[in-house]
A protein has these predicted regions:
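N-terminal active-site segment of His-dependent metallophosphoesterases
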Residues: 1-74
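His/Asp/Glu-rich metal-coordinating catalytic cores
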Residues: 55, 66-176
Length: 176
């Protein structure tokens, strides 16, 4: 029987993004909607834990860089720590709203099982279960807020490039 794996892919969380005009609705709706964005991340973590997924991918725009606060970072990193404690690795990349150059790296360090994919080049990670390579995770984050429309962000994110970067074990991974 061939191996299977489960994972959650989330993107565009925009933690810290403001909702505009909420006070015009009501104080209650303003509070609910303001809590909705970070609560979405909490639900991703809860789903990963309850379903015992193999890994979680969070691909781009984790934060709204101009608005993310210490509290926003704390909430996100607390979720990463819960995943880490459960043995669920996470793979992250930055987006145009939270380029790596604007991350508040002095707030927190990534847990041991969290991998931040590079922003200056295609990058890869190998997911293994019990020493068996099962999946190649590849991507490229945003190094800054502007990406040239002439440059293909996915250029170089290929299986061949992953196998070169990760070595011969990557060739055995059935999923890429």
């Amino acid at each position: 029987m061939s191996p299977s794996l489960t994972f959650i892919h989330a993107s565009d969380l925009h933690i810290g993004a403001p909702f505009r005009g909420l006070r015009e609705l009501s104080e209650e709706w303003a509070r609910r909607l303001s809590d909705a964005i970070p609560a979405a991340w909490d639900r991703v973590v809860e789903a990963a834990l309850s379903r015992k997924v193999d890994f979680v991918v969070v691909a781009g725009d984790i934060f709204d860089s101009t608005r993310a606060s210490y509290r926003d970072y704390l909430r996100f990193f607390d979720g990463l720590k819960k995943l880490d404690a459960a043995g669920i690795p996470s793979y992250l990349c930055t987006g145009n709203h939270d380029p790596l150059s604007l991350w508040q790296r002095d707030f927190f360090a990534l847990p041991a099982s969290a991998t931040m994919l590079a922003a200056d080049r295609p990058d890869f990670a190998l997911y293994e279960r019990g020493g068996e390579p099962l999946a190649i995770i590849g991507g490229r984050g945003y190094p800054n807020k502007v990406w040239s429309p002439q440059e293909n962000i996915a250029a170089g994110v290929t299986r061949d490039a992953a196998e070169k970067a990760l070595g011969p074990r990557a060739a055995a991974a059935p999923f890429a």
